[in-house]
Amino acid sequence: MSQPPPPPPLPPPPPPPEAPQTSSSLAAAASPGGLSKRRDRRILSGSCPDPKCQARLFFPASGSVSIECTECGQRHEQQQLLGVEEVTDPDVVLHNLLRNALLGVTGAPKKNTELVKVMGLSNYHCKLLSPILARYGMDKQTGRAKLLRDMNQGELFDCALLGDRAFLIEPEHVNTVGYGKDRSGSLLYLHDTLEDIKRANKSQECLIPVHVDGDGHCLVHAVSRALVGRELFWHALRENLKQHFQQHLARYQALFHDFIDAAEWEDIINECDPLFVPPEGVPLGLRNIHIFGLANVLHRPIILLDSLSGMRSSGDYSATFLPGLIPAEKCTGRDGHLNKPICIAWSSSGRNHYIPLVGIKGAALPKLPMNLLPKAWGVPQDLIKKYIKLEEDGGCVIGGDRSLQDKYLLRLVAAMEEVFMDKHGIHPSLVADVHQYFYRRTGVIGVQPEEVTAAAKKAVMDNRLHKCLLYGALSELHVPSEWLAPGGKLYNLAKSTHGQLRPDKNYSFPLNNLVCSYDPVKDVLLPDYGLSNLTACNWCHGSSVRRVRGDGSIVYLDGDRTNSRSTGGKCGCGFKHFWEGKEYDNLPEAFPITLEWGGRVVRETVYWFQYESDPSLNSNVYDVAMKLVTKHFPGEFGSEILVQKVVHTILHQTAKKNPDDYTPVNIDGAHAQRVGDVQGQELESQLPTKIILTGQKTKTLHKEELNMSKTERTIQQNITEQASVMQKRKTEKLKQEQKGQPRTVSPSTIRDGPSSAPATPTKAPYSPTTSKEKKIRITTNDGRQSMVTLKPSTTFFELQESIAREFNIPPYLQCIRYGFPPKELMPPQAGMEKEPVPLQHGDRITIEILKGRAEGGPSTAAHSAHTVKQEEIAVTGKLSSKELQEQADKEMYSLCLLATLMGEDVWSYAKGLPHMFQQGGVFYNIMKKTMGMADGKHCTFPHLPGKTFVYNASEDRLELCVDAAGHFPIGPDVEDLVKEAVSQVRAEATTRSRESSPSHGLLKLGSGGVVKKKSEQLHNVTAFQGKGHSLGTASSHPHIDPRARETLAVRKHNTGTDFSNSSIKTEPPVFTAASSNSELIRIAPGVVTMRDGRQIDPDVVEAQRKKLQEMVSSIQASMDKHLRDQSAEQAPSDLSQRKVEVVSSVRPVNLQTGLPEPFSLTGGTENLNTETTDSHVADVLGAAFATRSKAQKENSMEEPEEMDSQDAETTNTTEPMDHS
């Protein structure tokens, strides 16, 4: 058989109802050759035309003419997209593309044909509902599903009701993969046949083969799609066919006795069953006799086509199947005319897959020419004229125009979904997603829908299903059962770490996101998925994953972006945000408030909504105040006065001097960009021709530079040389624009802008002409407070002078912050010195006293404090806080990307770049923007979990804070410093009284974690009360005893004792003798043990104990001397405070973590090498007074996978190993 020629090019699709080319630029994009070289590289965006999807799509203007939707999987022509426009801010889009390209992350896996959604329905979704449609119908009055027998329509749906229906595909869906044109090779195989049909229809393409899934039910899928366009009735068709054969078996046997043996009919009937599975090796399936039976079930003819060569052959590869067992008068529709035939075809020469041929909506009904009308199968040929209305030329019309409306079909599906939920307790769309992500992705095919439904239901009940908020992909928290049994990975890890496992403890495995309990009867670990949490998406590795309920809804956290579109949000992301069970257009603004009543002081944070499109969602000041007072002072007599005070406080906080001033609460991931979901912003449209990642203050050799041409090298050199000059020109231009910008709005014309909350009265916006004085509360970072009255015309420099008079702080040492979150009040730009400060009556400002600046005259000092970076201020003065936040987010995104490319976590990569923690670095800038810089202020970063940092004003940098030892400069060897200090501090702890530890007996150190006894509580542990802050939403917060911090702060500056490695050289003879033994190793200053873990000589132990006592005495003596010297330098006003510090500092240092009982000196250092990223053991113990030598770093052992243990009653699933 000769291979047919390739198909001719397809005609262009018809224009959409609303042409997106609304501007000359977009019109040029559609015309070839009408674009310049630069504009050919533009990026366009548009929305998916599917009304149930409408995802935002991005594509190059010169790219493919068809775009695949990243949300529903459909492929659309560019002309069919809605709202096509040029993207003027491609940065985020390119950033996402770069991430995907370099990491090989394509987001959610490509949707296969079963999961492509059209009008919100996928093929697999329809398959799941089909068994329900065989027994249920929809009540027209209520729209709810009812059993057919309750509607007096029998037990089984009668498919003859679909005898006059035909599906016509929408033109925009013709090329949708999995729904439109079949792509299994049928277009090539049927090319000649389709060309003949096309010529018979005035050269118009009006009958096309469409896709059906090849899952063993392709015949009934093809018939169902030809009838209603969906695979909804495959189950009913099979049951109808089986029932039809059983009821008319005698007639069939008589009609086909010459062709089909009587013994075959049992197999033929069994093959109709929906659950039929053919015996292994037996090629059974639906065939011609079943097509003939379906024609009689539907009361309409079915035409089977093949390639021209197949139709001309002697085989039964094509035929016309007539409903010959049904009287012709019963094969008519409501209009009295004969039901028009439907058409199916073979998809390949293998003839093992059926596909339907359907017409196109809006085009003429397809006609099949006489020469392609096959002979009748199984019945006399003259019956064709009896059951098919032939045209004058001998052809016939295919299908007809009576289609089920999409609106009715969606109502029918929604009614069946309710029944599915009632029967199985899970939504069919969720089952379809489980099949996509957990079966198809692993190559598992042929799994019955019942099995997938049961597996999905169990995963939901076990809290193992999570959905990514960015990609919408499902992830499963699953651990192989063999890992939890004896000999398994996790079982052995728990056994080796904690010894005998106990049923009253929970065992945490942070690297596997798993918490387990122990079953002593079965001797296995049992996963507790209620306490376990999946922390990253299995597809994109993002952290925005949330649990999924059985109905498919997501268990959102406050601040999460939902899938609901928002039209009036100020945040600009285009979606609503979840907060306390409701969906809002915006994230709330947050501000602190203090309640005082009856000697009790309570501090709370108020979350305020004020810009909602639905006014009922706006916060009501009286409701908020009443809830606060009722929450903390329930039933208090006379609390109405407190309510009124709270109302006034909230009104002061929410009164807007500028209606556009919107500073929402910072939620990590709340505005994370989804795939194809980025909104364009106003930036330069010049697109980069190369994408290059650069680090701060470092030169990076890029991949593109390896094969650069000479011209490219010259251009790059010119750009490098001219960059500073161009930047300076740009800065000067911005200065001139700012200086020459006229004020076009008269103060008298400013209207009062009331709040959008009807029940919440607000103040009028700030107006410089108001005659009222403004009272401002000022607080310094050393604890002083005052109320200052300002005139309406008070300028920045007058405010500085008022602060200097009130607190005796020179202007050059003042850093003024206002608003929430606090932001620095910058000095006025050139020419605007007389402008009043943007403060309102009732505002609060904070004064940060700068340190380490050279004192000078007031004028020069003020210049050094605020105007050193005037060029930078001129450039960045116009940037909003949102833009600054986006810039920091992009820097962090690039850092995370580079860390992933290097195969390291963020901390391991960042510690090798100390400049990131110094002035100008990304972490330094985040802390400065969010909370301000003050010496000794602590903070944490969500990208560096388990790490606490402190600002060192003298060095102007961030340093790593380790709970028990002090602060360390960031560098590649900082972990070595910490681990060395862990050994030293542990050795010191052996000399202290075990009873002096406040948490004695509650914690035990293990090689991989901490075990908490289930029956005991940590009542006597004091939480951290210092200046610690969390930037964003970190996963955990260290808790530090202030007494230990005061003590260790003194120890850090102590110079009386040398803790370096050199001190071991001057040990007494007993240690010299001990060290001469090749088996003795040093685990801390003055502490040695046996390498093989055996006990050493008791005399040596006693000598070690005495030596440690001498060291502690020396330390305490040095502390006393240091404190006496320090106290002598302090002012008399601070004397009482210093006495308290001396008492707390010279008190023996108590570690918050108890030691194993009994504590053995033979523990070895290898078991202490745990990662501080996942375990807080090093954070509890660690300090670094000496630098690990190079040899130690080279000989350090590989750290074992670690695990933790926690109380079974602990509910903190985010950080199972919390410590105090």
Swiss-Prot record:
UniProt xrefs under InterPro entries: OTU1_Ubl (IPR048857), OTU_dom (IPR003323), Ubiquitin-like_domsf (IPR029071), VCPIP1 (IPR039087), VCPIP1_N (IPR045827)
Bias type Polar residues, positions: 1208-1220
Region Disordered, residue ranges: 1-40, 724-778, 988-1008, 1113-1140, 1185-1220
One GO biological process term: proteolysis
Recorded superkingdom: Eukaryota
Modification after translation: Phosphorylated at Ser-1205 by ATM or ATR following induction of covalent DNA-protein cross-links (DPCs).
Active-site positions on this chain: 215, 218 (nucleophile), 353
SUPFAM superfamilies: Ubiquitin-like (SSF54236)
GO molecular function, one term: cysteine-type deubiquitinase activity
Protein name: Deubiquitinating protein VCPIP1
Compositionally biased spans, kind Pro residues: 1-19
Matches recorded under CDD domains: OTU_VCIP135 (cd22769), Ubl_OTU1 (cd17059)
Localization (cell): Nucleus; Cytoplasm; Endoplasmic reticulum; Golgi apparatus, Golgi stack
GO CC terms: endoplasmic reticulum; Golgi stack; nucleus; synapse
Keyword Endoplasmic reticulum on entry: yes
Primary role: Deubiquitinating enzyme involved in DNA repair and reassembly of the Golgi apparatus and the endoplasmic reticulum following mitosis. Necessary for VCP-mediated reassembly of Golgi stacks after mitosis. Plays a role in VCP-mediated formation of transitional endoplasmic reticulum (tER). Mediates dissociation of the ternary complex containing STX5A, NSFL1C and VCP.
Modified residues (Phosphothreonine): 762
Oligomeric and partner information: Binds VCP and the ternary complex containing STX5A, NSFL1C and VCP.
Catalytic activity: Thiol-dependent hydrolysis of ester, thioester, amide, peptide and isopeptide bonds formed by the C-terminal Gly of ubiquitin (a 76-residue protein attached to proteins as an intracellular targeting signal)
KO phenotype (gene knockout): Mice were born at nearly Mendelian ratios, although the birth rate was slightly decreased. Mice display genomic instability and premature aging. Cells show an accumulation of DNA-protein cross-links (DPCs).
